[in-house]
Structures are given as C-alpha cells and as structure tokens.
Amino acid sequence: GVKYDVGMESRHDTKEDIAPEEKNNIVQDITYVAILKDYGKDVTIPCPEGYNKDEFACACASHVCIMPKEPDRVWSKDMMITYGKLPNNKYMINWPIEGNDYYVNLIEMTREEREEALKYAKHYTMCFVYFLQHELGFNTLGLADDEYPTADKLPFIPYHRESRRIHGLVRFDLNHACEPFRQSQPLYRTCIAVGNYPVDHHHTRYHGYEELPNLYFHPIPSYGLPLGTLISKDVEGLI
C-alpha cells in the first residue's frame, strides 16, 4: 500500500528548525463544532456527566479564569462568542483556547473504534456548551435545531486538522514554503495549488502539550504546493 507519515517528523528528517528532535505520532486536536442559536429564553442543558468547569475556565476572560494555559491569548467574553457569529442569530462554536478542541488520534483506528472515540469528542463539546450557558451566562444559546439533520444536532463529522501524509515523489517541507528559491529542488516551479496561512497547530488538549514545539501561527509567506506531493512513490496509477 501507500506509505505515509502521521504526527510530527523529526528535524533530522525534514531539516525544519521548529520540528521536534524526535518524531512522534501526535496529531492535532480535532473539534466537534457546534452551531448555537439564540432562542430568546433559558435553554440551559442538564449538567453533562463528568463536567469540570476548570477544563474551560480560561476560554475567555471571566470570573472563573485564574491560571490560563496561554496568558497572551485570553480574549474577552464578547470577542470569544462573536468569533464565529453567523447570520440568523447563530454562533459557530469552534474555539481552540481552552474550548472544545479535543485530542484523539483516530487515523489508524477501526470504524468501530472511531465511532466510540468520537462519542467522547461530542461529549466534550456538550460540556463546553454547558460552560457557556451556566458559567458565562449565555443561557439563551442552545444547539440549533435547524442546522444539521442529526439526532444530536451536531455535525456529521468533526473538524479534522490533520490526516495521513503520503510518501510522494517529493517531500514539501517548511523550508520550501519559507525560502522556495534557495532549495536544491525548485519545487515552486511545479506547484498546482497555493496556500496563504501561517503554520497553526492545535495541541493544547494533548496531555503533555507543554513539551511540544510551539507552532502557534509560526509565520510563513504564501506558498505553492507541488504536484509531486500528491503522487505516491510506491503505488503506480493511484493518481
């Protein structure tokens, strides 16, 4: 089959100065995004089993925020809730700062194992919804009943930030993005897609995230993705 990498590669393999010393299989946090709607009345849900407000205490500046994980990223309550404001009095809840990000590596699980693991990710989002309602006073906001045709009113799938990275004909790394004209391989000449976003990893729900490289909005210029990254070097005719 197609060979691939998962997690973070070693700096010895990629020559990236922000990569870890040793490779690991730690993927980015996923998020079970929720769409809330303002019902104009108290719609606070029952307290979810195992709820712990401390896990969300510094999602924003509030009376319960004492020791934030990321002191320079504590937004106001209003900025936090309006970050994903939508039309029709709805709000997207996809909040990485002590919010509903959730760590699980689903990549090599069976279908049954994934379904079971995602129950916990959904539950974590519902705990955050309860935190918003009960601790922060957003008690008129509840899961929108007209957004997703699902029994639990949550999306069909979570927000995945990372997947397998195949072993392609070429490897595109941070150095090619940052300094495309100084590399031994002029991969920029074969680009088929462009990107324009910093290196933004979500890891704070991983237990032990403090030991990982700080990859929060590491700046890079706009870049081109070369065709060779999408063509497997092991399997003929896949693409």
Predicted regions and their residues:
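Flavin (FAD/FMN)-binding glycine-rich loop and adjacent Rossmann-like elements that form
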Residues: 2-239
